[in-house]
Amino acid sequence: MKLTRGLFLLMFLGRMNASAFAAEKLIADYGGHAGFQSATWIGRDLRIFEKHGLDVEIVMITGAARSVAALLGNSTHFATGSATGPLAAAVRGSDLKVLAASYNKFPYAFVVKPEIRNPKELRGKRVNILNYGGSNDLALQLALKEWGMKLSDVQVIIGGDAPTRMGALMSGRIDATILSPPHLTIVAKAGYRILADMGDMSANFTQSSLYVKGSSLKENRDRVKRFLRGYAEAIHVIKTDRVRTMKVFANRMRIDDPETVRTTYEYFAPRFSFPPRVNLDGVRDTINFYAEQNPDFKNRKPEEFVDQSLMDELDKEGFFKKLGQ
């Protein structure tokens, strides 16, 4: 009888321990199948988040507005994407904070039909972007501004993720679009003209950021910190582990051509930010740009939208230094 009770107690305690150490289930989004959006893929597919006690499901949500809506509606716990979405929502009163950024430059190139030889020949042409208010929109407007043109000088076509826009360009339904590898690599090989690499533009930009609801940061700070650890470790893997990263790239991007996978990796890996701190100049440039059109952005400071306190904690604890050893 005593033996039976002892076995029952051991089984009960075993279940308690398994439950206590079970990974916490969370949902994070990613914006598409381009290399700059890969931090969450790597964290999930290489089981990095599990090392930090998290069972993370990742879902694709295209467009900043949809990503913000999913986060505010509690459909996701963490959102990733350009800072335009959380900034635009925050100036309207939404409780959002940008915590980190894996990519602090535009990753795009402006691609056109071969017969378009310079920016002035874009006048009246059909330019396809994902949506208004996102990084595609801002990249287009900043490029036109550098070329001395206005948005009204072109026909803006809205809709379509990167593969869809690539297909529209190659089928002749549009004249120009904004792409990054691997889609940029494919169209360049096919003879389409790269009019400008937006990474070379003077403007800084928080392209791939990690953001959460401010209430989550306060109420679930440890959980958010563990996710940030996994996110940062995934970025470190991208920059240092070519073989494993390229396998994930090939799978997630559905690319069979090893050369395209290689060029995509070589384009993005050096440009990732590690540690993934937000470049406040990029946030400031975005605020200043939107302030010309929206008075809500006037006299606002990056620090109102960005909270890097967890980044500071991880830095102080030596987390980033340990990953680099």
Each model region followed by its residue ranges:
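Ligand-binding clefts/hinges and TM-proximal coupling segments of bilobed small-molecule sensing domains
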Residues: 134-150, 154, 229-260, 303-306, ...
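Bacterial N-terminal signal peptides that target proteins for export
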Residues: 1-8
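Pocket-lining segment of extracytoplasmic ligand-binding domains
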Residues: 84-85, 157, 163-254
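Hydrophobic helical h-region of N-terminal Sec-dependent signal peptides
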Residues: 8-12, 16
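Secondary-structure end/capping motifs
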Residues: 218-299
